[in-house]
């Protein structure tokens, strides 16, 4: 008995001593403490103040220093190598909401460089397609076979002579690579899986319900076909018409806009001033030119970053030159590449601050956004309660296969200024949703003074996604919408008001025509 009491006393005294020592060490900062899970800070998605999960302890944690982006890591993200699984948030909505339409803009997939660096060997890349070569995809062989039936489809005349598959064993300049094809087979398949439970396109879809358009470049046409095949494998060619967009801005008959051109010229002058003032960039170009035995201005004109990105994305060593008559020799380096990429990232930061590009982007993308809004309105009208749907239906799926010079201004015009520059095979998705109709017993919304009570038909909402991420509440027209007030999605009317009126306020104008043709003060 006595021994047991002594043992218990020893345990109590020992525990107390350990507690005192632990508290003393924490007080002296010898043991780091970590906040509990519900107090641990995190980065807000939009770069704002982090919000703690769980109950608020009313404690403020200093935000850690945000490191400068790593130019090389950013470049690998730009490559978008299809070697990992990807989470896509397309097709997500509150229960019982109906998906009415989807409009997608894609940037073409990985391509061969548009420029070559003088005195260096061009990167050796095979642009034919083979399932035995990586990267590959289960749909690659069926896709190749299906493209052989493309003569059954309908093509706008400028596209009829464009090859439907990349086909050169030694890639031509700007040609889509097998990586680019696989990127878009994956993209299309991702959306097919996201929407298959929503019955977006019935099995007996009509030609009127699908709209596919592309610029005249083979890389955009082939990217669009790969995406569409991933989305709708073994589709019926006889139902498909592929339409040509002559402008990379997809502006149709509304491309004439003098003010847009002025803003673009001012933006290009800003870019030039920033480049020539960057002494590190200038030193790097001089070093690279000396290595290759070139004049610095000749190297600049060759836009070496385009070719170097191709080497990086395909795991090919950077170009080297043997000793020549000029005595120059050596290889271009990752450090030199990083300097050029760093300057490009700096340019993106200044571009957002100055605002010239955003003005250009709004005018450049208004025709496309207005067409997007019109399509949504037609689909919404076709789905009104008690209305007889139009014979053949409305366009419920639109695919626009475009370039970086299309998607970058689109992101800016939407107010997504913090979005990363469009990588290879980037995608922007617009989803139109309809809430369930009010049922008997649910209270109706009160009408305004002198107005009629609102019909029981469901309300319309919009989602915007960029590379699978829901960015709706980062857009200009929905940033201030309170999604916790029983409306978890962005009302379509916000988007319509923005496109028809609000986006021209920055020009003190009320319409696209006025903003485009008003004489500068």
Where are these regions (language model features)?
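Signature for phosphate-centric chemistry
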Residues: 2-211, 215-398, 402-521
């Amino acid at each position: 008995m006595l021994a047991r009491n002594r043992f218990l006393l020893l345990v109590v005294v020992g525990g107390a001593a350990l507690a005192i020592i632990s508290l003393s060490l924490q007080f002296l900062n010898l043991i780091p403490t970590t906040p509990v899970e519900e107090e641990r800070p995190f980065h807000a998605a939009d770069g704002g103040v982090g919000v703690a999960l769980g109950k608020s302890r009313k404690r403020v944690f200093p935000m850690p220093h945000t490191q400068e982006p790593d130019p090389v890591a950013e470049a690998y993200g730009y490559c978008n190598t299809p070697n990992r699984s990807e989470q896509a948030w397309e097709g997500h909505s509150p229960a019982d909401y109906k998906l009415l339409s989807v409009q997608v803009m894609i940037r073409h997939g990985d391509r061969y460089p548009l420029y070559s660096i003088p005195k260096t060997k061009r990167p050796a890349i095979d642009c034919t397609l083979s399932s035995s070569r990586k990267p590959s995809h289960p749909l690659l062989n069926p896709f190749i076979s299906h493209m052989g039936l493309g003569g059954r489809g309908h093509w706008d005349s400028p596209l009829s002579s464009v090859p439907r598959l990349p086909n050169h064993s030694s890639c031509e300049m700007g040609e889509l690579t097998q990586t680019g094809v696989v990127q878009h087979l994956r993209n299309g398949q991702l959306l097919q899986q996201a929407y298959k439970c929503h019955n977006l396109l019935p099995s007996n879809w009509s030609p009127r319900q699908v709209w596919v358009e592309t610029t005249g470049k083979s890389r955009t046409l082939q990217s669009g076909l790969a995406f569409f095949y991933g989305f709708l494998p073994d589709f019926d060619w006889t139902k498909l018409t592929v339409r040509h967009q002559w402008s990379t801005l997809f502006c149709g008959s509304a491309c004439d806009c003098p003010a847009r051109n002025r803003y673009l010229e001012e933006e290009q002058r800003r870019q030039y001033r920033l480049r020539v003032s960057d002494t590190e960039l200038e030193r790097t170009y001089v070093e690279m030119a000396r290595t290759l035995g070139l004049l610095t201005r000749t190297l600049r004109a060759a836009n070496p970053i385009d070719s170097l990105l191709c080497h990086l994305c395909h795991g090919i060593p950077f170009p080297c030159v043997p000793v020549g008559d000029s005595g120059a020799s050596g290889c271009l380096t990752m450090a030199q590449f990083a300097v050029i990429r760093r300057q490009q990232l700096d340019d993106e930061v200044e571009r957002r601050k100055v605002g010239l590009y955003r003005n250009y982007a709004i005018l450049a993308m208004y025709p496309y956004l207005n067409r997007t809004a019109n399509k949504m309105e037609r689909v919404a009208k076709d789905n009104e309660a008690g209305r007889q749907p139009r014979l053949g239906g409305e366009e419920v799926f639109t695919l626009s296969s475009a370039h970086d010079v299309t998607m970058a201004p689109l992101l800016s015009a939407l107010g997504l200024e913090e979005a990363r520059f469009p990588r290879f095979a980037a995608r922007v998705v617009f989803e139109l949703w309809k809430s369930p109709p009010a049922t008997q017993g649910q209270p109706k919304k009160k009408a305004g003074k002198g107005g009629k009570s609102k019909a029981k038909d469901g309300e319309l909402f919009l989602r915007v996604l960029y590379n699978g991420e829901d960015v709706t509440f980062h857009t200009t027209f929905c940033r201030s919408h309170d999604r916790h007030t029983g409306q978890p999605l962005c009302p379509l009317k916000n988007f319509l008001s923005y496109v028809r009126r609000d986006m021209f306020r920055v020009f003190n104008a009320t319409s696209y025509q006025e903003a485009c043709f008003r004489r500068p003060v």
